[in-house]
Amino acid sequence: FPSIPKDHKAREYISTNMIANFFGLGWAATPAGIKAMEELEKLEDERRKSPVLGKRGVPKGIANTEMCTFLIVNISSLQLIPINIIAYRTQYGSTNPTRIVGAAILATTVSTVVGVIFAWVMERVKKV
């Protein structure tokens, strides 16, 4: 998220959300994701008010590029340890509940990479 200032609070919430998702803790990622979106909206409000950045801002009620990219990354949810799937497999008697980890890492990596590329392409198309 290069267009978010280095010291902006949104970066902290985005990082917390991504780390929680990375470890398969979706329930812990949700509050950080909500706060990140709120902070991104505040950032967009600041851009709208700025005489220099005002042209960059999007109309109120429309998600900006950072919001869309964050949602894509959040939804694709790159995971190292799919805790919920392991728990379900254990609950239903799997003899090797962690066998899914490799496939889960591959699937979430591919979905995250494709999502980020999609967001990047859409940003470029929007600028044309």
Regions found by a protein language model. Name each.
Residues 18, 23-27, 74-79, 108, ...:
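Mid-bilayer segments of alpha-helical transmembrane spans in multi-pass integral membrane proteins
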Residues 1-33:
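Hydrophobic alpha-helical transmembrane segments of multi-pass integral membrane proteins
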Residues 10-20, 63-73, 96-102:
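The feature identifies polytopic integral membrane transport proteins across all domains of life
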Residues 99-128:
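Juxtamembrane and boundary regions of transmembrane helices in multi-pass small-molecule transporters
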Residues 41, 93, 122-126:
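Signal for well-folded cores of large energy- and translation-related assemblies
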